[in-house]
Amino acid sequence: MIKVILWDIDGTLLNFKMSERYAINYCFSKFHMGTCTDEMLQRYSVINRGYWERLETGELTREQVMLGRFHEFFESEGLPTDQVKAFNDEYQIRLGDKAFFCDRGDELVKQLKSTVKQYAVTNGTTVAQERKLRLSGLDQLLDGVFISEQVGVDKPQKAFFDAVWNEIGSYAPDEVVIVGDSLTSDIRGGKNAGILTDRKSVV
């Protein structure tokens, strides 16, 4: 019997693509970089995903991901790279300006609130995730939030989940399920932790 659900946030409960589009367009306007077309945004998303996957394998640090993805993207689009850090700092803030639920994610969390413990487990940045959780109301619905930047280690590392267990207590492996969209972060992380996994299928 499931007693604990570990929810990924971006791409699982909240629609990251919509927040990403808003934040990128906002920053392009603020930094006078013209228009970010759909084709450009798609190319950025591919670059961004690659950097996050390298973080998950331990190949890159978080700072290398934050700055490297935009440096590579700007170079590929012929844009100046001198404001990469300022752009990323603003981008992180703007990611938290708006929160869009995936499918009926909010309704599902509400329905499950009285029957299971629910926690957020996310590799997103603190500044972006705390604002999105507050704006969406998830901070009031969930029993707790674990942000890898604060934990000090990222999903899918087993040490991340060990930190979760230290906070919430011990459960049998078949009493905990992680629900997420990422095979490399959420599903692999769940397998590393020895718990049940669900690739977003319940959302």
Give residue ranges: language-model regions.
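Substrate-recognition element of Asp-dependent hydrolases with the DxDx(T/V) motif
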Residues: 84-88, 94-100, 105-136, 144-148, ...
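Conserved Lys-Pro-Asp/Glu-containing loop-to-beta segment of HAD-superfamily phosphomonoesterases
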Residues: 154-187
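Conserved small/polar residues in nucleotide/adenosyl-binding loops
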Residues: 202-203
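Structural motif
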Residues: 192-193
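Short acidic capping loops at alpha-helix termini that bridge into adjacent secondary structure
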Residues: 83, 140-144, 172-176
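N-terminal helical cap/lid subdomain that shapes the substrate entry/recognition surface
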Residues: 2-103
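Residues at the starts of beta-strands that form the adenosine-phosphate
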Residues: 117-118, 175, 196
